[in-house]
A protein has these predicted regions:
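Conserved beta-strand hairpin/beta-sheet module of binuclear metal-dependent hydrolase folds
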Residues: 14-67
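Active-site HxH/HxHxD metal-binding segment of metal-dependent hydrolases
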Residues: 61-112
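Metallo-beta-lactamase
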Residues: 2-23, 94-112
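Short amphipathic alpha-helical surface micro-motifs
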Residues: 8-11, 24, 33, 77-81
Length: 112
């Protein structure tokens, strides 16, 4: 039997597992079992870092990235409008956010 993990009570450095897939490119994995779920990717550039798909599965992905992965300013890139890819964009409202025009229109239309 697997123990349930309450991610909200974990210290920020234990809320995710990060995997370096190539230099300056990370995949963040949260505690989601038996689920085909989107995972944020972080690509670190010379001046900024991009969070690709903030998702809806993680608690405070921005805080984690800023404290554990990089101290560079962040931008977000949304691949498409589905909430499981964009819900946590609100954490980065003061960051530059990139998405297609269609994605922006779909987010506006489907905003709850």
């Amino acid at each position: 039997m697997k123990a349930n993990i309450d991610v909200f009570t974990l210290p920020i450095e234990k809320q995710f597992m990060r995997r370096l897939i190539k230099p300056d490119t990370w995949i963040l994995n949260g505690f989601v079992e038996d689920c085909a779920a989107p995972h944020p990717h972080v690509v670190i550039g010379s001046e900024k870092a991009a969070v690709i798909d903030t998702t809806d599965l993680f608690y405070n992905v921005r805080e984690y990235v800023e404290k554990i992965v990089t101290d560079k300013p962040l931008i977000t890139i949304s691949t498409h409008w589905h909430g499981d890819h964009t819900k946590n964009n609100y954490e980065c409202e003061d960051c530059d956010q990139y998405m297609s025009q269609r994605c922006w229109e779909d987010i506006q239309e489907n905003r709850v």
